[in-house]
């Protein structure tokens, strides 16, 4: 594995498991120091301990991204400790669940909860860390979803919001030399996908893929490492699908 991130710092939200942990493992393998957050403190501690046992340098913070004061407190602490931050991966999000497809049962409280974590938190964190990212001419990666292109009431709409926000961030942050892109994963074999999709839905969506492969969190992490690296120095304001061609057919 190349060491494209030697001497660099990567901030990864939702890093206790799934795609967040895969990002952490990939960036650590390529030499990055890690700053990890999650709302699940015990799971985050286990993940950080396992990463350190593999040789990674990482610090872990419990942050509830639904709460603006916690986001700002975390960002202020990082900015005070680190003059430069090279990568911010806005990976944390609330997954599908019942309200993703049950329009009639979607309450204002539930909608605002999805919106705050999936769309507002990435904006607040990027805003608050803009100075150290600018000093490093860093990269922001937003993790959206193939669901942003299909009818998925709460989850899909908030991820579509994050797609649009990616364009807005790229437009503003480009003046600072900060690249902003998003990854839109398709169906991935992660605990969240298995827990939130009925088996028949999982099988149907997987069957729509143009490539008959099992997508994994490592596939998304590999794409993220490319987009955050100097190999992608001329790429910004893009939403890159990682879905085996599923977007072409639509997730029904």
Located regions from the model:
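Substrate-binding pocket helix/loop in short-chain dehydrogenase/reductase
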Residues: 99-103, 107-112, 205
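Short, small/polar-rich loop/turn modules that mediate ligand/substrate recognition or access, typified
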Residues: 137, 174, 179, 235-237
């Amino acid at each position: 594995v190349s060491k494209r991130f030697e001497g660099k710092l990567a901030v990864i939200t939702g890093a206790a498991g799934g795609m967040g942990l895969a990002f952490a493992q990939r960036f650590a393998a390529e030499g990055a120091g890690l700053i990890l957050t999650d709302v699940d403190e015990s799971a985050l501690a286990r993940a950080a301990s396992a990463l350190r046992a593999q040789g990674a340098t990482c610090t872990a913070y419990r942050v509830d991204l639904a709460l603006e004061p916690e986001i700002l407190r975390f960002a202020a602490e990082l900015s005070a400790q680190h003059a430069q931050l090279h990568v911010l991966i806005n990976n944390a999000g609330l997954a599908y669940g019942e309200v993703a497809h049950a329009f009639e049962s979607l309450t204002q409280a539930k909608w605002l909860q999805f919106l705050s974590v999936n769309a507002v938190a990435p904006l607040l964190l990027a805003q608050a860390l803009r100075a150290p990212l600018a000093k490093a001419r860093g990269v922001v990666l937003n993790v959206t979803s193939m669901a942003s292109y299909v009818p998925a009431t709460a989850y899909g709409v908030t991820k579509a919001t994050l797609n649009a926000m990616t364009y807005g961030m790229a437009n503003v942050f480009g003046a600072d030399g900060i690249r902003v892109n998003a990854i839109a994963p398709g169906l991935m074999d992660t605990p969240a996908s298995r827990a939130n999709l009925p088996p028949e839905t999982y099988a149907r969506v997987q069957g729509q893929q143009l490539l008959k492969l099992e997508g994994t969190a490592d596939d998304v992490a590999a794409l993220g490492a490319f987009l955050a690296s100097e190999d992608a120095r001329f790429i910004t304001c893009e939403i890159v699908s990682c879905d085996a061609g599923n977007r072409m057919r639509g997730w029904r």
